Amino acid sequence: MPESVIAGIPVHFPFEPYNVQRDYMEKVIICLRDGTNGVLESPTGTGKTLSLLCASLAWIRTRQSEHQQQMIKLKATSKEGGPGSGPGGDLSELAMTVGQANNWGVPKVIYASRTHSQLNQAMRELKRTAYANMRSVVLGSRDQLCIHPEVMKEQGNSNKVNLCKLRVHSKTCTFQLRVESKKDHPDFRGPSIMDIEDLVRVGQKLKMCPYYASKELVAQADITFMPYNYLLDPKARKANKIELGNTIIILDEAHNIEKICEESASVQIRSSDVAMAIEDVTHIMKVFTSGESQEAGGDEPKDFTLDDLTLLKEMLLELEKAIDAVVVDNPTDGTTYPASLMYELLGKANFTYGNCATIVALLDKLVQYLMVASQHMTIRKGGTFTMLSDLLTIVFANKENIMSKVHLSFKVHVQVEESNKQQGKSGATQGKQQGWLGKGNITTTGTSSKAAKIVNFWCFNPGFGMEQLLNTQVRSVILTSGTLAPLKPLIAELAIPVAQHLENPHIVDQSQVYVKIIGTGPDRQQLISNFKNRDNPKYISSLGQTILNVARIVPDGLLVFFPSYPMLNKCVDAWQASGLWADISCKKPIFVEPRGKDQFTSTMEEFYQAIRDSKGAVFMAVCRGKVSEGLDFADRNGRAVIITGLPFPPLKDPKVILKRRYLETNRTKENQLLSGQEWYNLDATRAVNQAIGRVIRHRNDYGAILLCDSRFQDASQVQQLSKWIRGHLGARPQSSPFGPIVRELRQFFKHAEETMKQPDVREEEQPLMNVCKVEEVGTLPVIPTIKQEPGNNATFRKANKSAIKVEMANSINSWTPADYASAAGRTLGKAAPNAMDFMSRLDSNVSSIDFNCSGSADSGSGGCGSSSLVTIHKRERSSPGVTDTVATQTTKKRYKLAENIKTEPKSNSSQQVKVAPESRADFLRELRSLISQDQFRDFGKVLIEYRSGTDENFESLMTVLLDVLAAPKMRYLFIGMRRFLRNEHKAEFDVRLASLNLAQESSPNKRIP
C-alpha cells in the first residue's frame, strides 16, 4: 500500500490519499501526539472513517516500535550491569517487567459509534488497510453474542441478561465454562479481524461463549470497537472491564453526541413500577414463609434474608407514598421541579449515597432469584427491580460534591401516568392487602385515591457525561462526523478543551452536485411544511406534483425525506386518494420506510433490486429515521434527494421546552452556548444534513439536492447547513421558479452522464471478509441490467453492452446493499456467517456473464461470435407489472452449449452443463460442501493474496484452483471462478482452461475466445 508521511508519521493508505484526507489525518495525528482533543468534520463520502483508522493506528504502530526500542535498550542496560549489580539493575529489571506487562507508554484506541451497524462498517474498512493485522475486538450485547439456546428463547434483552447471569453464576452455562480453555485457540486468537458475526461463528464452532470470550481480548487489543453506551455508562465500563487511562477515545458519527450524553444521565420511574416491585417483594416473602422456597428456588442457600426483604419493602412503600404526594398542577403537560426533588423522594424512603451500592446489589440478587423461580411458576422475572437498580445507579452517580452543578443541569418533570398503565398499580394494591401480614401501614398508602405518576429525571447538560470521561485520564478524545457544524456551540455544550478543529470541504467537484431551493411547486403553490400548512390540501398536492416532475427527470434512485412519520403518512394517503401516487408509480416504483426491523430489511432489499431496472425507484423516508442515519445510496442507488421540510422537534414537548429554557438560563458571552431558538433550529438542520449525506458518497459520485421548503431561504437556516452545501447556494440563497429548475436539472443529469465516469470495477480494492447475504431457497435472482428509457444518451447504451457491471466503484469504501443486509443481521437461510466471504467485494452484481468472451465489451459486435460456449443472458425488464412478476418466477437462465465442452464423459445425447451459482453466498456454500476444510482454507488464503496484484499471486491462485477444482465434476466451479478475476488475468485463465480440457477430454476442444 502507498505510504505517506503525515505529521512525521508514516501512514499506509489503500491508495494515494486526497488532500482532504491528508488534512484530516494530520489533525488526528497531532491530537494523538500532543494528547489533546479534536472536533473534526468531514462530509460523508470523503473517506473519514478510513482516514481516522489509518491515522490513529499508524501512530499507535509507531509508538509500539519506539516502545520496543526502549525495551531493548533497557534490557541491554540491565545485562551490562550484571545480575545483582545493585539497585539500578533491579530497577531496570522491574521497569522492563512492568513495561512488558502493561505495554508501557503505548496508548490504546477505543472506537465508538452509535450502532453496531456503523461499527461493522468501520471494521470492514479496517480489513482493507495495512493495519488489518493489529489486535482488535468488538464488544456486543448478550442479545447479539449469546449462543445458549435457552437464553436466546427469552423475550426482551433484560430477561436474556438476567438468565445469562444466572447460568454463569450457577455454573450451568457450558459455553461460558469453555472460555478459559478455548480463549487461546488459533481460530479465536488469529490475526483476522472479527466482527459480531465472526465472533458468533467462531463461538459456535468452538462451543465457546462469544460474549465472555470477547472480553478476554480487550486487555491485549490495540483497538476496541464498541457502541456509545458501553463507553459513556460507568456501569457498562465496569462490567466490560474497560480501562480508559492513557486511552484514545474516538467518537464517530458524533453529531448526536449531545443527546446521547444527556440520555445516558437521564432516567425515569413510574408509580406502577414501584407498585409492581412491592408486589414482587411480597411474593418472595410469602414463598419464604410458606416453605415453598425449595420448590421455587432450589436447594441453594439464598443470597438475601427475610430481614433484607422486609427492609426493602418498607423502603419501597415509603417511596410509593412520596411519589403519590407529589402535586401535578397541570395533568396534561405535567409539572417541573428542581433536581433536588428526586433526592428528596429517595431520601424519604431512605435511599442514600451511603446505602445505594448495597441496595443495588440486593436488587440484582432478587432478579437472579426470580429468574430461577420463573422456571417453576408463573411470575414476573424482576424487570421492575432492574428499573429501580438503574434509577439508583444513575441518580447517585452524581457525587455529593457537585450537587450545585447537578441542580443547574438536571430537572425533575412529573407527569400523570395514563390510566391503562395503572393496572399493575391496582394489582399491587390488592397484593399488599392480601399478602404478607405484619406491616400495618401496607393498606394505608393511599394509592387508590392518588393518580399514578411518572417521575422523569432529565439531564440537559451533555458536558456531564464528557466530564466524567475526561476524569478517567484519557489521552485524547476525537469527535468526528459528517455533520458537526457549527463547531463552536458543540464544543461549548460538551465543555471539553479542544485544540484541533476541522471543517473539511467535500471531495467532489462543484459540477458533480446540483443544489436548489424549491420554494413553489409546479402550480406556484408555496412549499412550506410548517405546522399551519401541513393540513393544507393544496400544499400536499403541490408537493406531490413536485416529486412527480422530479421523478420524470432523475435517473435511477430518488430519495424523499419527510419531517416525521405522521407527515409522511398524511401525504401518502392524500396522494393515493388523488391519483398522484399512481402517477409517480408509473415513473418509478415507490417504497416507504417501515418501522419494523424485519419489514425494513426486506423493503431495502426490494428497493436495491428495483434500482437495477431502468426506471429506478423512489424511497420515501423520515429524517432521523434508519434510512437517513446509516445507509449508503451511492451511484445509481441515489441520484437525487428531496427534503420536504425541516424536522423541528415538537415545540410543546416538555423536554424540548426545558432544554430551551436551560440554554437561555445558562448562556453567557464566555461559554458561547446557543440560544434556545438557535438550538431548536440546529436540531432540525443537523437531521437534514444527515439525510442529504446519503447521496454523494465518493469522489466519482454525482447527484442533486432539492430543498423543497421555502424556509431554506432564511440566512440563519442556511448557515447551519454543512459547509460544502452552503457553497452551492451562494451568499444570498433564493428559491427559483419551478420551470427553470426542471430545465437545469435535466441538463445537469445529461451532462453528468456524458462526462462523469460511470461505476466500474475497482481494481485496487482489497478483499473483505463480509458476512455473505444468504438468498431465499427456490427464488431466481433477477439479473440486473443498466439500461435507460428510450432517448437517453449513448453512455448508458454503451454501458449496457458491458459483460460485467457493478453498482459501486468508490475509491473510498462505503455501504452497499450486501453490506446493509449483513449489518442488519438478516439471514434467510440457516448457514452460519462466513468469515471467508472474500468475494463480496471482488466484483458486484453481475448483469451479463459470457464465460467465453475475452474481447472488448465495447466492440460493436460484443467481441464474441455465435460459437460462444456458455453465456448467461440478461432478462430485459420493461415494467414492474404482473407480467414481469410472472416472468421473474418462471423464466430460467438460458445457456448456449457447445458440443465439445463436457463435465464428464456422457453419451452423445444433449446434456446441459452444470453452471456455478451466480450468488457469491451460494457459490461459497457449494464450494465448501464439495471440498475439505483444509482445501477451503488454502483456497481462501490464496484468493486474499491474489488481491495484492502480482502475477506471482495469480500463479499461486491457479495452482490451488487446478489442484482443487480440476476434476471433471468440479469443472463448473473452476469456470465460475473466472468472473472473480481481474481483467488482465482472464485471457490467461482461458488458456489454462482450454489446456485443461484438451488434456482431459478425448474430443478436440476449442479455446474460449
Swiss-Prot record:
The keyword DNA repair applies. This is Regulator of telomere elongation helicase 1 homolog. GO terms for molecular function: 4 iron, 4 sulfur cluster binding; ATP binding; ATP hydrolysis activity; DNA binding; DNA helicase activity; DNA polymerase binding; metal ion binding. The keyword Cell division does not apply. GO terms for cellular component: nucleus. Residues 7-322 form the Helicase ATP-binding domain. A probable ATP-dependent DNA helicase implicated in DNA repair and the maintenance of genomic stability. Acts as an anti-recombinase to counteract toxic recombination and limit crossover during meiosis. Regulates meiotic recombination and crossover homeostasis by physically dissociating strand invasion events and thereby promotes noncrossover repair by meiotic synthesis dependent strand annealing (SDSA) as well as disassembly of D loop recombination intermediates. It comes from Drosophila pseudoobscura pseudoobscura (Fruit fly). Pfam families: ARCH_RTEL1, DEAD_2, Helicase_C_2. GO terms for biological process: DNA recombination; DNA repair; DNA replication; negative regulation of DNA recombination; negative regulation of t-circle formation; regulation of double-strand break repair via homologous recombination; telomeric loop disassembly. ATP binds at S42, P43, T44, G45, T46, G47, K48, T49.
